[in-house]
Regions:
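Active-site and substrate-binding clefts of carbohydrate-active enzymes
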Residues: 2-164, 301-541
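Short, solvent-exposed turn/loop segments enriched in Gly/Ser/Thr/Pro and often Arg
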Residues: 56-61, 210-213, 265-274, 410-414
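Extended, H/D-rich, highly charged conserved domains that either
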Residues: 125-197, 218-219, 232, 268-312
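Long amphipathic alpha-helical scaffold segments
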Residues: 166, 171-172, 177-189, 194, ...
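Short, well-ordered beta-strand segments enriched in hydrophobic/aromatic residues
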Residues: 209, 549, 590-598, 662-667
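CE4/NodB-like, metal-dependent polysaccharide N-deacetylase domain
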Residues: 230-268, 356-374
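Acidic/polar low-complexity flexible segments
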Residues: 530-542, 611-637, 659, 669-713
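Beta-strand-rich interaction surfaces with strong enrichment in secreted/lumenal proteins
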Residues: 580-583, 649-655
């Protein structure tokens, strides 16, 4: 009987945060994800022995975890969390406050009452330049919770110390702090053995990525970016295929030393591939590689149906040969970006329903289907309820009980289906089948130019030999990593962008220092330009726009509040930003809302649904509108008003119209909102029962409605 074979590949990666000269870890995220994800993601599979999966381990991440496990890692963030609260200097207090709330508020801060209480107190006391008045006990509790919130569900439920800290919640002691530091080292020490255990049993396969996570096609030849994006502005040519080979060879050696055998498989950093990369990988002994369905589409020159996607391929050129699978971009991104907003069971049901539907025709024809699900194995879970563990248990349990569905490793899957031949692979990544995230923008190109200068300096500094030369070359390999240019350019944002910029320039400066040369002055200046975050402008007066879906006149929305979303993603990429701008305001009797959409998505709106929730800011029930979009406009599909409004004269409590923009009117009395009262609201866009965008991404937008009496004053 034909089967559906699911190939899950979880990519585990963090940038190389260690400065090789100072020995310090400049950011704590490898340690934090070791607590929250690296162990728990593989440990959960022991509950589901039928589920076989592939884990893609980046050696530079594993090396950092090993340093934390040995106690050799020097981490100022951990040191600050362990310092006695009574002894904190003013500088350390500011450091603790700045870095203790880098967590998702909904799922990682407010989940724990004391952490949420401290977060609210920090926000309330944080006017520009103001000093936050926390007691020593407040600081100690914050030091503990900034770490505890990152402990995996496994430890929160089964480890006696961690479970007791979570239960107690407050009034932690210095002994608790010290034990918490020891516990982190213990957990880091459990990561590698857990992978070794399940790899030895055959339940998981270990694949890898080039050692410091470079975009291999660009390291081989940066000019190849012009193939996938003609006319993209490019920096001076960087062409060092020998570095690409070295990064891959180091990875194979590292994995072989840890797991007793070299890896068969390769997830090139960010799914970035080219014929030259495949040739090098094949020559080094890799037998398979994975990339994205977008790359397959551009390779064959057209959109590939699921019959073509759900099968393996065999790439051959000259003496080179590699098995290749292409990730289902849509299904993988559902886990990465959409299901976090849904009930765990409903999300698992939706996922498997889509797979059954996609595979029905393939199975009916008598063929097996191989479905590659490939995504980040760490960053998505902080946006899920309880770190995504309820969702994974629902999903794995259902797959285990499906008679025509089997979860396999990639190598297992490649043995089960005959491959389709490929004589060429289009150069691209999993993001839009090009390399635009890492090259082409002004910041990116400046980073590549500085990398090239350092690389050329290394080649010419032949007088330096031995350990210093080796360390200089290692710094070059680190600087070739993809993570630095991930944060340059317009695509992504993080509060840590300045630290990433500083760390990249430090790695390049260290190249010169190890070569006994003074770093060029340009490395002392930030590459980053000024960021443009989300902006919010309060309403300045009453408005009464015509609800026609058109910008009838500049003046009809004059006085409205404006919210412009920050359109950069964080550490995850794949979020669609459909809404460009929100305008809002009121008159004596109505609340008005206008959504302006990005032109690139205007044609995709038909079939979507806008959901608007609004109500009094202080207390009271919220009202809800569901608005369906069609090619001809928009209609209200559902309206739940806080106050009964059946007897309101036409056009009733609410109306809407979609053309160039979406315009919405909602009666203030029907919402239970008095004139002059504060109102809060949020909007989301849905398609096929899945959330696609939300404004704002967290929390509510707020405004005060028009008060005629106040205006007369």
């Amino acid at each position: 009987m034909p089967q559906t074979y699911l190939c899950f590949l979880w990519h585990m990666h963090q940038p190389f945060y260690k400065d090789l000269i100072s020995g310090e870890y400049k950011l704590p995220w490898t340690r934090m994800h070791a607590l929250k994800d690296y162990y728990g993601m593989v440990r959960i599979l022991e509950e589901f022995p039928k589920i076989h999966q592939t884990f893609n381990l980046v050696p530079s991440m594993m090396a950092q975890v090993a340093e934390y496990a040995s106690g050799a890692a020097v981490d100022p963030y951990l040191q600050a969390a362990l310092e006695p609260a009574e002894n904190l200097s003013e500088e350390t207090r500011r450091f603790v406050l700045r870095h203790s709330f880098y967590s998702d508020p909904q799922h990682m801060i407010y989940r724990y009452p004391r952490y949420g209480e401290l977060f609210d107190a920090w926000k309330a006391q944080k006017p520009a330049g103001g000093r936050v008045m926390f007691s020593a006990q407040d600081f100690r509790d914050l030091q503990m919770w900034s770490q505890l919130a990152w402990f995996d569900e496994e430890f929160q439920q089964t480890d006696p110390d961690v479970a007791e800290w979570v239960r107690r919640g407050r009034n932690f002691t210095l002994a608790d702090q010290r034990r918490m530091g020891e516990k982190q080292r213990e957990i880091a020490g459990q990561v590698q053995p857990e992978y070794q255990k399940l790899a030895a049993s055959g339940q998981i396969e270990i694949s890898t990525t080039p050692f410091y996570h470079p975009i291999l096609p660009l390291v081989c030849d940066s000019q190849i970016a012009g193939v996938s994006h003609p006319n993209v502005p490019l920096p001076p040519r960087f062409r060092y295929p020998q570095d690409a080979r070295r990064q891959l060879a180091m990875s194979r050696e590292y994995i072989a030393n840890v797991f007793g055998a070299p890896p068969a498989g390769l997830w090139p950093s960010e799914g970035s591939v080219s014929d030259e990369v495949f040739s090098i990988a094949s020559d080094l002994g890799f037998s398979w590689a994975a990339t994205d369905s977008g790359v397959l589409n551009r390779t064959v020159g057209h959109g590939v149906p699921v019959e073509g996607l759900y099968r393996p391929y065999q790439w051959r050129q000259g003496k080179g040969s590699l098995g290749v699978i292409f990730r289902d971009h849509f299904l993988s991104d559902l886990i990465g970006f959409v299901y976090s907003k849904m009930d765990a069971a409903a999300a698992a049901d939706d996922f498997l329903h889509r797979i059954r539907d996609n595979c029905s025709g393939i199975l009916a024809s008598g063929r097996d289907a191989l479905v590659p699900i490939i995504l980040d194995g760490e960053n998505a879970w902080e946006y899920y309820h309880r770190n995504g563990r309820p969702f994974l248990r629902e999903l794995y349990g259902r797959i285990s009980n499906e008679p025509r569905m089997t979860a396999v490793t990639v190598s297992e899957g490649l043995k089960l289906l005959a491959p389709e031949p490929l004589d060429h692979i289009f150069p691209g990544s999993w993001i839009n089948a090009n390399f635009d995230v890492w090259i082409g923008a002004e910041e990116d190109n400046q980073a590549w130019t500085q990398l090239l200068r350092a690389r050329e300096t290394f080649d010419s500094a032949t007088a330096v030999t031995g350990d210093k030369r080796n360390l200089a070359f290692e710094e070059l390999l680190i600087a070739e990593g993809s993570d630095w240019c991930w944060w340059y350019g317009p695509e992504h944002d993080s509060e840590n962008r300045p630290e990433f910029d500083q760390l990249y320039r430090s790695h390049l400066a260290n190249v010169y220092r190890f070569l006994n040369l003074a770093p060029p002055e340009e490395l002392s200046r930030p590459i980053l330009r000024v960021a443009l975050p989300a902006t919010m402008i309060e309403p300045t007066g009453p408005i009464t726009p015509v609800i026609d879906g058109e910008v009838t006149s500049y003046f009809e929305w004059l006085g409205a509040g404006v919210y412009r979303a920050d359109e950069r993603a964080g550490s995850m990429h794949g979020k669609k930003f459909l809404v460009k701008e929100v305008q809002f305001g009121s008159d004596d009797v109505n609340f008005y809302l206008r959504l302006d959409f990005h032109a690139a998505y205007q044609q995709e709106l038909a079939g979507m649904e806008a959901r608007i929730t609004a109500g009094p800011r202080e207390n009271g029930e919220t009202s809800y509108l569901a608005i369906g979009f069609t090619h001809g406009g928009a209609t209200i599909k559902e309206a739940r008003m806080a106050v009964a409004s059946e007897n309101m004269p036409p056009p009733g409590p609410a109306e809407c119209m979609l053309s160039r923009v979406l315009e919405v009117r909602v009666s203030l009395p029907a919402m239970g909102v008095r004139r002059g009262q504060g109102i809060r609201f949020q909007c989301s866009l849905w398609q096929g029962g899945l959330p696609m965008d939300a404004v704002p991404q967290q929390g509510w937008l707020e405004m005060r409605t028009t008060d005629p009496a106040r205006m007369e004053e």
